[in-house]
Regions:
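Alpha-helix-loop-beta-strand connector modules within alpha/beta enzyme cores
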Residues: 49-68, 121-128, 154-162, 225-228
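C-terminal helical cap(s) of enzyme catalytic domains, especially alpha/beta-barrels
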Residues: 248-266
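Hydrophobic faces of well-ordered beta-strands that scaffold small-molecule active sites
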Residues: 4-10, 36-38, 59-64, 98-100, ...
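Acidic/histidine-rich catalytic cores of soluble enzymes
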Residues: 130-222
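Active-site acidic/histidine proton-transfer and metal-coordination neighborhood
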Residues: 35, 74-166, 187, 250
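N-terminal pre-domain/capping segments
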Residues: 1-93, 261-266
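Acidic-and-aromatic substrate-binding clefts and catalytic sites of carbohydrate-active enzymes
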Residues: 14-19, 35-48, 66-81, 105-109, ...
């Protein structure tokens, strides 16, 4: 097992970062983060880079739409600039892996659609390589609730990807999609280089189409986070994330950081 570095997905602090990007990144650094996972970064490369330099932060992974141009994500926030623009911005920020965060549920219902998504991501991987980068995919729940000939659409998709394409498994959404996350990680093996660490109660009806508002700091919900991290063979980054959080988001992130730091040093 690789010992992952701790990171945090900046979507978790979307509101504060829109109001004060530099101050938000400073707070994350004060919690102890050395890594963040940027999103919606193309429009603000210079501001991000200045704050990264000021606080000793890096963004080894980042999110950008690559497969489904014009996609409206559940939060409705991500723009879809051209791939060359995405990869140039990523390289300027020091990103190594650009991860597509979302392909809509309608694209997972049949083999032809899944094949198309894999083809587009493979093409993006070839383009990314021109910039010295690689690409990956981040899941929600619907990739698992759709099946093709008895296999989840997600695993069909993974099997169609070029070996250079990596996976970032969102442990919360995989669990919400009915998966045994540790077993899934063992099946996927070295393809999974990052995980999203988020937690909450698992109950019927949880879906990314209606983001739940009862997520909790890591280790306080029903997601098998520790077992999942131990099951991964090649996880380089454990990325804290909240889709929504009812409390103080910085306190929630700090609690999740402490949980991960304690887990990983054990």
């Amino acid at each position: 097992m690789t010992t992952p570095q701790i990171s945090v997905q900046l979507y978790s602090v979307y509101g504060p970062s829109e109001a004060d990007l530099d101050g938000t990144l400073g707070k994350l650094a004060s919690i102890g983060f050395k890594n963040v996972e940027a999103f919606d970064f193309v429009r603000r490369v210079d501001a991000l880079k200045a704050s990264f330099d000021a606080y000793g932060l890096s963004s080894p992974t980042a999110h950008a739409i690559l497969i489904e141009a014009g996609t409206a994500t559940p939060d409705g926030l991500l723009d879809t600039p051209p791939a060359d623009e995405v990869f140039a911005a990523a390289k300027a920020l020091g990103v190594g892996t650009v991860i597509d965060p979302y392909v809509p549920p309608a694209r997972w219902g049949d083999l032809a659609s899944v094949e198309h998504s894999a083809k587009v991501l493979n093409e993006a991987a070839a383009k990314a390589a021109e910039y010295g980068l690689r690409v990956g995919y981040h899941n929600h729940d619907h990739e698992f609730t759709s099946t093709i000939n008895g296999t989840t659409a997600y695993e069909v998709f993974a099997g169609l990807l070029d070996p250079s394409v990596v996976l970032e498994l969102d442990l919360y959404w995989a669990t919400a999609g009915g998966q045994d996350a540790p077993a899934l990680l063992r099946r996927l093996g070295d393809r999974v280089v990052a995980v999203h660490v988020k937690d909450g109660p698992m109950r019927p009806g949880i879906t990314a189409a209606h983001l739940p508002d009862d997520q909790v700091p890591a280790g306080r919900g029903d997601v098998p986070l520790v077992e999942s991290i131990k099951a991964g063979s090649n996880i380089s980054y454990a990325v804290v994330e909240f889709d929504k959080y009812a409390g103080d988001i910085f306190e929630g992130i700090a609690d999740s950081y402490t949980f991960l730091a304690d887990t990983l040093k054990g």
